[in-house]
Amino acid sequence: CRLYPFLLVKKGSSLQLGLHKSCCFIEDKQPVLADIQTYAQYLKNRLNAPSFISAIRKNPEIAADYQENVELITDLKDIFTKAHLPKLNKLTLKDKPRIEGYLLKSKTSLSAYHFADIFIWKDLFQIFWLIIEDELCIFYQDKIGMFMMLPPLGKFKPTVIQKCFEIMNVYNQNSAVSRIENVAREDTTKYSRLGLSSKLKDTEYLCLRKDLIELAGKGFKSKRSSCNYFVKNYRGDFLEYKDSYCRDCLKLYQSWSRQRKDRHQDSIYQQMLEDSFLSFQTALRYYKKLGLSGYVVKIDGSTALTTGKKIKACTFGYPLNKETFCVLFEICDLNFKGIAQYIFREFCKKLSGYKYINIMGASDLENLKTVKLSYRPKREIGVYNIYQK
């Protein structure tokens, strides 16, 4: 009724916005075509709201069958498509067992394949999941558009890939935004056979845990020296993380972030630090529920106003499979020489049973890449994004 004299009209398999020509108002005022089209565009924009799309999905009878006394003004194809797409489920912690069931079958060493790494970005993206032909599909959406954070989890099915791109294309004004992220290099051939293109997103580094603990040989001389310096000059306590440390760890991140920004003026890097803080905050808030492991280093931070040891470094991570553990965060007060090397070595000591440590990628930052390579990784894993041509 609020649309009248405009109507939602079904014609064949399409949805149209029509004008009831027999309406008294239309017959009396006889508005010019330009005014009708302007208002129709306004209505089209309003009808594109999620609340309306949900309403038409639940009540398809809202749209009447086409009649000759109705003039079709504009096509509502995008709205019709959205209304008939599968409903996307918003990701919550309650979905963790379902998601993990699929992730555990993937048997990959890529850092993105853990529920924690999916969930911690919830304050930057709306995160949705959907089951298509028994495959789990995870979508991220923000103001720019929608993409898949992971490839569909399950058996590789071309029909599922096609459906996923159809869903993303509906939500994205520019189909170039539609993509599937975090695809392993060895899987890119499957996508190329479907006429899709791949682009290197990042390279992740896997180190032998044994090497990171022993720091033996010339290749690790500087790391070994840094650890020795820290142990000799600071009375640090290496402690398992607990919830009461949360506030101090968040303060440490903010201090560390300021230090990094002072050293690196690149605007993209600085934005990454701000985005990462939101994910770090979420990780600490849901630390236990996400299955994270973490440790802190406390050092005597006594001043004229405070006494006692303060948290000057913290680190967190999660297991990817039986062989590989991923270090997700490492935050350190850079004023304490050797603290980064020390907490990393001590964390690795605690990870008994794992052969490899995934230290993640460098995100196209050369200084970070240099640091990663200085730990002499044994394997490099190419991480790709998949696009439509």
Task: List PLM regions with ranges.
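Short loop/turn segments that flank or connect secondary-structure elements
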Residues: R2-H84
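Acyltransferase donor/substrate-recognition loop-hinge adjacent to the catalytic core
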Residues: R193-I268
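Short, conserved active-site entrance elements at the starts or edges of catalytic domains
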Residues: S244, D248-A304, G308-K310
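Conserved donor-binding loop and adjoining core beta-sheet/short helix segment
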Residues: A112-V183, I299-L334
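Conserved active-site alpha-helix within GNAT-family acetyltransferase domains
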Residues: D187-K199, S225, D364-E380
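A residue-level signal for conserved active-site and pocket-lining positions in enzyme catalytic cores
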Residues: I99, F230, K372
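Amide-forming acyltransferase catalytic core, primarily the GNAT-like/NAT-type
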Residues: K82-E135, F139-Y140, L278
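Aromatic (often tryptophan-rich) hydrophobic motifs at membrane interfaces
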Residues: L292-K389
